[in-house]
Curated annotation (Swiss-Prot):
Residues 120-190 form the BTB domain. GO terms for biological process: cerebral cortex development; dendrite morphogenesis. Its main location: cytoplasm. GO terms for cellular component: cytosol; nucleus. Strongly expressed in the primary visual cortex. This is BTB/POZ domain-containing protein 3. PROSITE patterns: BTB.
Amino acid sequence: MVDDKEKNMKCLTFFLMLPETVKNRSKKSSKKANTGSSSSNSSKLPPVCYEIITLKTKKKKMAADIFPRKKPANSSSTSVQQYHQQNLSNNNLIPAPNWQGLYPTIRERNAVMFNNDLMADVHFVVGPPGGTQRLPGHKYVLAVGSSVFHAMFYGELAEDKDEIRIPDVEPAAFLAMLKYIYCDEIDLAADTVLATLYAAKKYIVPHLARACVNFLETSLSAKNACVLLSQSCLFEEPDLTQRCWEVIDAQAELALKSEGFCDIDFQTLESILRRETLNAKEIVVFEAALNWAEVECQRQDLALSIENKRKVLGKALYLIRIPTMALDDFANGAAQSGVLTLNETNDIFLWYTAAKKPELQFVSKARKGLVPQRCHRFQSCAYRSNQWRYRGRCDSIQFAVDKRVFIAGFGLYGSSCGSAEYSAKIELKRQGVVLGQNLSKYFSDGSSNTFPVWFEYPVQIEPDTFYTASVILDGNELSYFGQEGMTEVQCGKVTVQFQCSSDSTNGTGVQGGQIPELIFYA
């Protein structure tokens, strides 16, 4: 009895994902089947391999809205045109006698059949109304590549139509999936990768789905992390979700100020506002929430009023830790935004100033943020009467990591002759391209300790690639310098390798010199 129930559930799951024509036909056949015995009914259930992974019905955001465009705006249609040209080329090859002999492997011969009308026994009308493409297919090849296609063409509820409509998949994404099934090639583009992931999930092509996720992880940045977080939850990809959180936590202010933040759904907004480890000032969180509310009003066709902004924010407003803002930020920002009621504004002012603090609906405990890690590359430091001097020359070192990290700043030495102030220009480059830089001052107390100098925003560092860390210091006093430098340092779970940089003109290298510490989040 339990087995029958399980089979029925699998059958129902499969049935819900079938095209309407199959559903209607199966309903008619089920009426006929009711006249038979129960054992006969159970024998007609599809086998276990027909179980379908259903996708959530919430609308997925297209990758073209997430990634910076590297192609023209019509690159999706361009992809379809390229596939169409390949279709014409394939068809032109067929009249040649013994064309099979031109290709030594089964993979190459199968590739000729990709997007080819020769021997096609099914056609797909793919895409929403007004944007459809009619694509040829070969049932045997498709069934070998996907258990869903196997069920559609060879299962108990097999589709017997010559033409199948698929309105919920983009043509370019469907073609990318077919190319993988026919040619064993993965051809992904930034503007179609999410749609391809949707197709791979729908038709259970797991290796292609994994490749899509890897593509998204590689392309992940503060600009698209919030939107990808929302999408990764919809696609049920926990590894991608975790990667998104790592970026959002470490580069919170950049992520919150990105255009993509305004495109997230309400549930994702709540998750971000609730996040304990956001590395951001609370006034930035507040302003980001208001920006999201403005766009949400437009999505809901509401007037852009203070009342409507508060309405769409709802209870999420109380996830913003307004009482933890600097008093100036609150007085000049949140208090004058109009979003807070007069009572809320008064109570928060009392929270800042009164000995007896009022009860607030807002969270009053500051976020923990992330704890920075320090990678120290020298085993000792020293000073001599004739070193180390700064004359506006560059101290530089190259480094690489084995895991993605976010460089927040450098730890620098100070004066070896008592207290002194230094002006420091720090810079981080990859293959000559500046990724981050900052000009600031720091005060040293005469000790051999290192003193942190920060970038404006943490810089994302990818694994297995060398980056160049540079600093130009301006100070009159002699400085401490590092000795017994290490080429490889283990910092927690991150391994950092160092090598000399050609940019260094003041004597710094692997064995000794300046830039003793990298400060990072991991």
